[in-house]
Amino acid sequence: MRYDVVVVGSGVAGPIVARNVAKAGFSVLLVDKKPAIGAPKQCAEGLTINAFKQFDIPYDKRFINREIYGAKIYSPSGYTAELRYKEVSGVILERKVFDKMLAYYAAKAGAEVLARTEVVDVIRREGKIVGVKAKHEGEPMEIEAKVIVAADGVESTIARKAGIDTYAPPHEFDSGYEYEMIIEGFDPDLIHLFFGNEVAPRGYVWVFPKDEDRANVGIGINSDNEKTAKYYLDKWLKENNIPRNKILEVNVGLIPVGGFVKELVKENVLVVGDAARQVNPIHGGGMAEAMKASTIASKWIIKALEEENLELLKNYKEEWWKTEGPRMEKLLRLRRAMEKLTDEDLDVFVQLVSGTDLEKIAGGNYIEVVKALMKHPKVLMSRRRLEILKALL
């Protein structure tokens, strides 16, 4: 089997690369090791509304559970800050359908798609990578390709086999645990985020409504914690008198929140999405970031193939670090500052920020917010709080 491009992994990043490159007229094979693309999910399923237009994805009700109008955050002592829009700001997806439809769009654009196909190694000839070794339904196969895209998730095999350093220590990951469950008492038009060092160490609890009385209720905590994410989530449910006897689905996963893969390209191999740890360090969301990275990668793959010059692939790394890197590094600095906050600090800051401030913070445009906070008496009276905020400027 021989293709211009083989894409390993059919989550979010992989199908977008496959679709874009196939649309340009090149032969593409998209493979995924799972028997059913999209399952199991490892995601809270929230996506900004802007992504559909920005990345040319149909707004299809088949994979949209609920439209969302904003967010509400809760401090350890119950103080809240709310951001609410008049228009839809995001959606809660059905990832099992969404991911499969992304693969469908790639197939309709001309890509070939093979589920239950696990890539186990690269093929090298005369020191160069010329393809991948895989197993399709247990049968060995070799796939030759000019370009290989590693979009196979946080535990990427193919990037490692290609010699790309994707290692990160355990403390740079969060451990996630989530129930899809029946739950009542939360405004279903908003996502809800609960912070606190006793609630979710180094993370938060989320309630992402999928219906009036059904939601993804999950947690992310530092993966090197002596207690499990499940322990903290069950504790939060019990403390809030939320029965856990109507659980429809359980999902677990690792969330890379401590930094990004530096070497995004090596020879003819590109790494995108969770495999490159291209995840927003503040909220741990990776779908929109994967879409951005895969769009940039697609552009340079197409140019490299059109001009028959694979050296152009390096421009993916350069462009991502130039356009997305600075924002992501700022968010990483913010995350590291937030990890130093006590519950008392969290109470203070949640009382001081507005909904507009929350929007700026989540997008990495937090300098003005930080400067305003530094002038407030509750911050000025604490040298430690001032030092934490100064480090962000």
From Swiss-Prot:
Cofactor(s) essential for the protein: FAD
Keywords: FAD, Flavoprotein, Lipid biosynthesis, Lipid metabolism, Oxidoreductase, Phospholipid biosynthesis, Phospholipid metabolism
PANTHER family, alphabetized: DIGERANYLGERANYLGLYCEROPHOSPHOLIPID REDUCTASE, GERANYLGERANYL DIPHOSPHATE REDUCTASE
Pathway(s) annotated for this protein in UniProt: Membrane lipid metabolism; glycerophospholipid metabolism
Chain residues that bind FAD: 13, 32, 43-44, 46, 95, 119, 274, 286
Hydrolase among keywords: no
Reactions mediated catalytically: a 2,3-bis-O-phytanyl-sn-glycerol 1-phospholipid + 8 A = a 2,3-bis-O-(geranylgeranyl)-sn-glycerol 1-phospholipid + 8 AH2; 2,3-bis-O-(phytanyl)-sn-glycerol 1-phosphate + 8 A = 2,3-bis-O-(geranylgeranyl)-sn-glycerol 1-phosphate + 8 AH2; CDP-2,3-bis-O-(geranylgeranyl)-sn-glycerol + 8 AH2 = CDP-2,3-bis-O-(phytanyl)-sn-glycerol + 8 A; archaetidylserine + 8 AH2 = 2,3-bis-O-phytanyl-sn-glycero-3-phospho-L-serine + 8 A
Residues that hold a 2,3-bis-O-(geranylgeranyl)-sn-glycerol 1-phospholipid according to the record: 327, 363
Any one GO CC term of the record: membrane
Pfam families xref list: FAD_oxidored, GGR_cat
InterPro entries hit by this protein: DGGGPL_reductase, FAD/NAD-bd_sf, Geranylgeranyl_Rdtase_fam, Geranylgeranyl_reductase, GGR_cat
Protein's job: Is involved in the reduction of 2,3-digeranylgeranylglycerophospholipids (unsaturated archaeols) into 2,3-diphytanylglycerophospholipids (saturated archaeols) in the biosynthesis of archaeal membrane lipids. Catalyzes the formation of archaetidic acid (2,3-di-O-phytanyl-sn-glyceryl phosphate) from 2,3-di-O-geranylgeranylglyceryl phosphate (DGGGP) via the hydrogenation of each double bond of the isoprenoid chains.
Note: Reduction reaction proceeds via syn addition of hydrogen for double bonds.
Domain of life: Archaea
A single BP term in Gene Ontology: membrane lipid biosynthetic process
Species of provenance: Pyrococcus horikoshii (strain ATCC 700860 / DSM 12428 / JCM 9974 / NBRC 100139 / OT-3)
Cofactor: how bound: Binds 1 FAD per subunit.
Enzyme kind, highest EC tier: oxidoreductase
Record-given protein name: Digeranylgeranylglycerophospholipid reductase
MF terms in GO: flavin adenine dinucleotide binding; geranylgeranyl reductase activity; oxidoreductase activity, acting on the CH-CH group of donors, NAD or NADP as acceptor
SUPFAM superfamilies per record: FAD/NAD(P)-binding domain
